[in-house]
Amino acid sequence: MIVILKPDMGEKVPEYRQILEFLAHKPNIKTRVHQEIGTQQTLTEIYLIGDTASLDKAEIESLPGVERVVRISEEYRVLGRHRDDRRPTGFEYNGVKFSQDNLNVFAGLCAVDNPEHVEMMLKALRDNGQVCTRMGAYKPRTNPYSFQGHGKDCLPWVFELAGRYGIKVIAMEITHDSHLVEIQEALHKTGRPTGVMLQIGTRNIQNFELLKIVGRQRELPVLLKRGFGITLEESLNAAEYLASEGNRNIVFGLRGMKTNMADPHRNFVDFAHVPVVKRLTRMPVCIDPSHSVGTRDMAPDGMLDISHVTAQGVIAGANMILVDFHPVPSKALVDGPQALLLEELPYFLEDVGIAREAYEKRRALTRRFLEKRN
């Protein structure tokens, strides 16, 4: 059960203390308080854990300072969609909005290689009106002898270049809690010229200690990628780990499923799960066409497979796209064969816009149909 308080019901407000005191006297009930502190107001939620079936919802709603009470299922307690649950489906970070109702493109380098290529990528993004990117500093690899990323050494100049070209958010994978510390320190030392969305990759989705540590910090949002060898339910529960520790600013990423039936693609494209995740949870949903397809193969119509699956995800309602680009893919240190060219960026963005417009038209059509039927 979630008790949602009226805005700005903080610890110093008498009604806040009275509500907690009232709940403290309920047998077999524990409380956990979560606050979202914004520029305009503070929102407070009290999570009740235990024998909530015995609680009188109307009695709690009658308390001064309570806006409403939501009964929730055991599944996805924090992030799930529950009956009568009108909590928001997104968040804002560093001036960029992430929600189930909009779309952001994160085009960039799968792995940071050198300042020249990073600057070329960032300039192309700025020239095409983009404020988000992906930049890999830490690269978990299947082969121990493969390039593992430049790590903390590249962070200062990557952040400074991002700030120079107006990039507001960089999606950056971490594989260890020390990487979180290194990113926070580099942001501080460079004067925070940009922002970082921490990416937890498919290999670490069940690294529960890492999830807890990342969840306890609420400064940086998180992109959590689906695990390639586990069920969707298990992956969504990993997101609950993050949220239960306090960080609700989570985007859930679909990146294809590992299976021998995906050939000739790298993974089996799972973008049909975009509406499923949005139905089950309040998280925005990201698609990663580059790691789903893994090649630059082209269909007879002249369009790349990556473009086709991107459109599939967008027209299904995706809210974020993580896609690989590189100035010189043949020289990329990681995943060069799947990287798009900088000259393809304007085309890619226009193609995404067409798919998004089609999605919006489908939504409008559905609303008209439902209104007429009702």
Task: Give each language-model segment a name.
Residues 1-106:
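Non-catalytic terminal accessory/regulatory regions of metabolic enzymes
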Residues 91-110, 141, 282-295:
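N-terminal small/glycine-rich loop or linker at the start of catalytic domains
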Residues 93, 206-325:
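Catalytic alpha/beta core domains of metabolic enzymes, predominantly
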Residues 103-109, 131-135, 169-172, 196-200, ...:
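Hydrophobic faces of well-ordered beta-strands that scaffold small-molecule active sites
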Residues 103-120, 143-149, 169-174, 199-202, ...:
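Active-site mouth loops of central-metabolism enzymes
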Residues 134-152, 325-336:
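Glycine-rich, proline-tolerant flexible connector loops at the mouths of alpha/beta enzymes
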Residues 140-195, 207-209:
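N-terminal active-site wall of soluble small-molecule enzyme domains
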Residues 148-172, 214-221, 271-287, 316, ...:
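Alpha-helix-loop-beta-strand connector modules within alpha/beta enzyme cores
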